[in-house]
A protein has these predicted regions:
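Catalytic, metal-anchored helix/loop core of enzyme active sites in primary metabolism
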Residues: 1-383
């Protein structure tokens, strides 16, 4: 069955891999968005012929507008964060896939849900920063929330037997361990962005690759899993699975465990979200068990990797705690990639923000953005 897809964040790592899936399935692209990569989105417009395109960066939008001038059948151009929400709200697509990086994707997620669209969610920050708002909107509008993160897709797939899902007692959330697995604090002190960007298994963008190196990504995924699957954080166990073959598992009341396995390729969870509930042939090679010499399992070291410890504190505090942790991390990673702070400073700053307030209680969307702003300012003032 052909589908129409709106893809938010089309020029990033998840976005381009999503287009691999869309191309292979022969789906129609209704809308695309990017932040600033004009050349790449021009190539995508040429191939996929979307009806609408949004550029959230004003300078990039002006360049794209000039490049599209005079073209026959050029897409309508939307601009800025409001343009992104306008695109997410438009009637036409069967699914909106949100692969925007960071809290910038939250508004579009909420708008898509409130407009009645099924949402394939790669933007984990939507749930981390505004989990209560997102899950409340999903329930109110009766749409599907389809996880795209490989771990959450794995859990989602393991829970498709609705009767067994009632007996869920534990989630085993797997982690690769990142490029610095097994290292202690002193060994991490001099690590550079070049070191941190060398992920052993996954092809990802710069921000999420740094998050994998600090284990912040796993902390964010823990928070995301709490909102997606309704288990308290103490029932979600993080297990380091270095080969990234077991993508996560669930345990039931009889202590049986069901896991989802596959090659480490993001196009598997992307495809499952876009074709759900169907399973169809795709672009990813099958897993050859005869090549697997071993599968290893280890404990995540949150004493060394303080971002993970900070996220656990944040979700226990509740309220805006996870939002504060995320905002601090986004700002700290930006500074690290600009060579303005060291690798260990990321965890120090995230934990300091989480420790700075109680953060409990209910919140509005305005509160989320205010908390994010506060966390970023805290980081900049505590360098």
């Amino acid at each position: 069955m052909s589908k129409k897809i709106t893809l938010l964040g089309s020029t990033g790592s998840i976005g381009t891999q999503s287009l691999d899936v869309i191309r292979a399935q022969g789906y129609e692209v209704f809308g695309l968005s990017a932040h600033s990569h004009v050349d790449k989105i021009l190539e995508q417009i040429e191939e996929f012929h979307p009806k609408y395109v949004c550029m959230t960066n004003p300078d990039a939008a002006a360049k794209l507008d000039a490049a599209l001038a005079g073209r026959a059948n050029a897409p309508k151009l939307l601009t800025g964060p409001e343009g992104l929400k306008e695109l997410a709200a438009m009637d036409g697509p069967d699914v909106v896939l949100n692969s925007v990086v960071g809290i910038a994707g939250l508004g579009a997620s909420l708008t898509a849900i409130e407009s009645g669209h099924d949402l394939a969610l790669a933007n984990k920050e939507s749930l981390v920063t505004g989990g209560h708002l997102v899950t409340q909107a999903v329930a109110k509008h009766g749409v599907k929330l389809l996880p795209v993160d490989s771990e959450h897709s794995a859990i989602f797939q393991c829970l498709q037997d609705k009767e067994s899902a009632k007996s869920l007692t534990k989630i085993l959330l797997t982690a690769s361990g990142g490029p610095f697995f097994g290292m202690k604090t002193e060994e991490l002190r001099g690590k550079t962005k070049a070191d941190a960007l060398k992920h052993p298994n996954w092809n990802m963008g710069a921000k999420i690759t740094i998050d994998s190196a600090t284990l912040m990504n796993k902390g964010l995924e823990l928070i995301e899993a709490v909102w997606l699957f309704g288990l308290p954080p103490e029932k979600i166990q993080i297990v380091v699975q270095r080969q990234s073959i077991i993508h996560s598992a669930v345990q039931y009341s009889d202590n049986s465990i069901i896991a989802q396995l596959g090659v480490p390729d993001m196009r598997i969870p992307i495809q499952y979200a876009l074709t759900y509930p169907a399973r169809v042939p795709g672009v990813v090679p099958e897993l050859d068990f005869t090549t697997l010499k071993m599968l290893t399992f280890d404990v995540a070291d949150e004493e060394t990797f303080r971002c993970l410890a900070a996220c656990k504190k944040a979700i226990k505090k509740g309220g805006l705690g996870p939002c504060a942790a995320n905002g601090a991390n986004e700002e700290a990673v930006k500074l690290f990639l600009e060579d303005k702070i060291g690798f260990l400073d990321i965890g120090r700053l995230v934990e300091a923000v989480v420790d700075s307030d109680s953060f409990g209680g209910s919140y509005t969307l305005a509160d989320v953005y205010e908390c994010d702003k506060m966390a970023r300012a805290f980081v900049r003032s505590h360098l």
